[in-house]
């Protein structure tokens, strides 16, 4: 009788799905209120004028306008704002 010995087990073979994080609307782009601008873990980008922040730190537009990125403050923090057109 032909037999094949059982193969060993492996500890590999798992991976998590990518979360599609990052900047979704770039500087100078026109956006509508409610559009998501940045999806992030933690506050890599901070909310500036006319921006809201979700419980998962997602930044979104509160008003229609253009996206503007700035670096401000003594800690050189990155801020995202919406400038009215």
Curated annotation (Swiss-Prot):
Keyword Ribonucleoprotein annotated: yes
Molecular functions per Gene Ontology: structural constituent of ribosome
Database matches in PROSITE patterns: RIBOSOMAL_L27 (PS00831)
Region Disordered, residue ranges: 1-22
Keyword field contains Phosphoprotein: no
GO BP, sorted A to Z: translation
Gene3D superfamilies named among the record's database cross-references: 2.40.50.100
Pfam families on file: Ribosomal_L27
Highest taxon of source: Bacteria
Family: Belongs to the bacterial ribosomal protein bL27 family.
The protein's name in its UniProt record: Large ribosomal subunit protein bL27
Gene: rpmA
């Amino acid at each position: 009788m032909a037999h094949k010995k059982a193969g060993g087990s492996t500890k590999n073979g798992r991976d998590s799905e990518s979360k599609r994080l990052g900047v979704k609307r770039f500087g100078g782009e026109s956006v509508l209120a409610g559009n998501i601008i940045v999806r992030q873990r933690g506050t890599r980008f901070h909310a500036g004028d006319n921006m809201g922040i979700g419980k998962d730190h997602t930044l979104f537009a509160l008003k229609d306008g253009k996206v503007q990125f700035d670096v401000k403050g003594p800690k050189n923090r990155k801020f995202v704002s919406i400038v009215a057109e």
